[in-house]
């Protein structure tokens, strides 16, 4: 049975909806100092701040709690004004995962508890995708994290460094993430074919499930050279020999919000 208002479109690729027995918390990292679009967490979307829209969307999932983790009193106050729980964290965290590690400690989460990290600029995220990431991690004792991907259908996105690609092994674990075209279609490019290889490359979707114990351990893992080169913090996990399970989503991810033009496109959705 579906929760009222919740979308179950994202049961794709054989991953069942989250087991009601799987309890998980959604954490949303949010800060004002966005480099490409400053203050976007508080950008108005149909009368509500973006971060509040994200939290409301997350609340349609099966999460037992949705909490915003921020270093901004403005963001905390905006959340409180709309009934969204928010925690204040330190301002010196280098990544969103580091911020969420502090939030796990503040919340007193058990090491086995599942946490899903939803980015603070995803106001159109599918609630079913959140459930799928939590459910997949609960099923995969061989993995410390879960994430998601969607089959690319646009050749321009294949070559776009802002669209992160992922390749997986035979049992759905990430082998590598890259901003480069991945996998590289040698024969197609050698013959000048401007098309996508078959099977289609996978576009990474920036949602992550973790055990709270691993999330607390993440900041102690040394940064990897590949992480610095690609500017992708999930590569730190693979570098240290850990595994990430990948849910194949049937639903195309919502648009990213990195420029004023992106923001205007999303605003049209909210009228």
Swiss-Prot record:
GO molecular function: 3-deoxy-manno-octulosonate cytidylyltransferase activity
Enzyme class name: transferase
Location within or outside the cell: Cytoplasm
EC numbers on record: 2.7.7.38
Main localization of the protein described in the UniProt heading: cytoplasm
Known pathway: Nucleotide-sugar biosynthesis; CMP-3-deoxy-D-manno-octulosonate biosynthesis; CMP-3-deoxy-D-manno-octulosonate from 3-deoxy-D-manno-octulosonate and CTP: step 1/1; Bacterial outer membrane biogenesis; lipopolysaccharide biosynthesis
Protein name according to UniProt: 3-deoxy-manno-octulosonate cytidylyltransferase
Record family assignment: Belongs to the KdsB family.
Organism ancestry: Bacteria, Pseudomonadati, Pseudomonadota, Betaproteobacteria, Burkholderiales
GO terms for biological process, alphabetical: CMP-keto-3-deoxy-D-manno-octulosonic acid biosynthetic process; lipopolysaccharide biosynthetic process
Gene Ontology cellular-component annotations: cytosol
Disulfide bonds: none
PANTHER family: 3-DEOXY-MANNO-OCTULOSONATE CYTIDYLYLTRANSFERASE (PTHR42866), 3-DEOXY-MANNO-OCTULOSONATE CYTIDYLYLTRANSFERASE, MITOCHONDRIAL (PTHR42866:SF2)
Function comment: Activates KDO (a required 8-carbon sugar) for incorporation into bacterial lipopolysaccharide in Gram-negative bacteria.
Keywords: Cytoplasm, Lipopolysaccharide biosynthesis, Nucleotidyltransferase, Transferase
Known catalytic reactions: 3-deoxy-alpha-D-manno-oct-2-ulosonate + CTP = CMP-3-deoxy-beta-D-manno-octulosonate + diphosphate
């Amino acid at each position: 049975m579906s929760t009222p208002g919740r979308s179950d479109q994202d049961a794709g690729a054989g991953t069942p909806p989250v087991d009601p027995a799987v309890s998980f918390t959604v954490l949303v990292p949010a800060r004002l100092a966005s480099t490409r679009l400053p203050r976007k967490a508080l950008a108005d979307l149909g009368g509500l701040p973006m971060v509040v829209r994200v939290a409301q969307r997350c609340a349609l999932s099966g999460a037992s709690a949705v909490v915003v983790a921020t270093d901004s009193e403005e963001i905390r106050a905006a959340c409180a004004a709309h009934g969204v729980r928010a925690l204040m964290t330190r301002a010196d965290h280098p990544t969103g995962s580091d911020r969420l590690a502090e939030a796990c400690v503040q919340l007193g989460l058990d090491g086995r508890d599942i946490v899903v990290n939803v980015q603070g600029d995803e106001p159109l995220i599918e609630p079913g995708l959140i459930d799928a990431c939590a459910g997949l991690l609960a099923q995969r004792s061989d993995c410390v994290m879960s994430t998601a991907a969607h089959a690319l259908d646009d050749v321009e996105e294949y070559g776009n460094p802002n669209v992160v690609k992922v390749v997986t092994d035979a049992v759905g674990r990430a082998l590598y993430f890259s901003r480069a075209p991945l996998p590289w279609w040698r024969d197609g490019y050698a013959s000048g074919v401007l098309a996508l290889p078959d099977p289609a490359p996978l576009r990474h979707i920036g949602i992550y499930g973790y055990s709270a114990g691993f999330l607390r351990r993440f900041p102690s893992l040394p940064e990897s050279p590949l992480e610095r080169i690609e500017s992708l913090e999930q590569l730190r996990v693979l570098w240290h020999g850990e595994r990430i399970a990948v849910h194949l989503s049937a639903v195309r991810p919502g648009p990213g919000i990195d420029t004023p033009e992106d923001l205007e496109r999303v605003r049209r959705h909210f009228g």
